[in-house]
């Protein structure tokens, strides 16, 4: 497992960024996910750390390359805790290795 953006991921992220840039002033969260296979490397001691790095790679790309406002974005890792597919198959594990970008409506700041 790795958190580096591949050329294919950058191409997809460019398309996504162009589509969601109009929501740049909304609150945006970026969540990294992994499959359930244990990982233990010097760079990523566990799946949680790998998922954090995956999300932060996307966050950094959007801020540094696409002009997104860092003040309205957060990144976090969920590890293997929120699967969307069966981790017992290669296809399911591949689906679980992902980054999700969520956009939230701005709340009325006058309410205290």
Where are these regions (language model features)?
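Periplasmic OmpA-like peptidoglycan-binding domain that tethers envelope proteins to the cell wall
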Residues: 2-23, 33-112
């Amino acid at each position: 497992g790795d958190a580096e953006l591949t050329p294919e991921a950058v191409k997809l992220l460019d398309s996504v960024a162009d589509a969601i840039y109009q929501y740049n002033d909304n609150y945006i969260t970026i969540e990294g996910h992994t499959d359930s296979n244990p990982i233990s490397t010097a760079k990523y001691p566990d799946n949680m750390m790998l998922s954090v790095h995956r999300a932060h790679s996307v966050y950094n790309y959007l801020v540094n390359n696409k002009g997104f406002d860092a003040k309205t974005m957060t990144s976090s890792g969920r590890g293997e805790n929120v699967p969307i597919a069966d981790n017992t198959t290669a296809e399911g594990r591949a689906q679980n290795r992902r980054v999700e970008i969520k956009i939230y409506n701005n709340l009325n700041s006058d309410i205290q």
